[in-house]
Regions:
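Residues within helix-turn-helix
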Residues: 17, 28, 57
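Short amphipathic helical patch at the helix-1/turn junction of helix-turn-helix
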Residues: 10, 38-39
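Short basic helix-loop element that most often maps to the first helix and adjoining turn
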Residues: 4-22
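Absolute protein N-terminus
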Residues: 1-3, 63
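Short C-terminal boundary/hinge segments that cap the last helix of small helical domains
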Residues: 53-63
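Hydrophobic micro-packing sites on short alpha-helices
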Residues: 45-49, 60
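Recognition helix of helix-turn-helix/homeodomain-like DNA-binding domains
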Residues: 25-38
Length: 63
């Protein structure tokens, strides 16, 4: 699954640490998601979509 988390994070001038704290996860989790090494749980995907005010489908898409 590809995603636009990195681009969205940068558009808000957030560091990986900042987004991790907002979402209640580790910086390593954010790194893995941004590098397409980890597909987030549905709960985490929903938190990300709520934070960025976008649908899960807009942020995460099949490769």
């Amino acid at each position: 699954m590809k995603n636009s988390v990195k681009e969205l994070r940068k558009s808000r001038n957030l560091r990986q640490e900042d987004l991790a704290a907002i979402l209640g996860v580790t910086r390593q989790t954010i790194i893995a998601i941004e590098n397409n090494k980890y597909d987030p749980t549905l709960e985490l995907a929903m938190k990300i979509s709520e934070y960025f005010e976008m649908s899960v489908n807009e942020i995460f898409r099949l490769k």
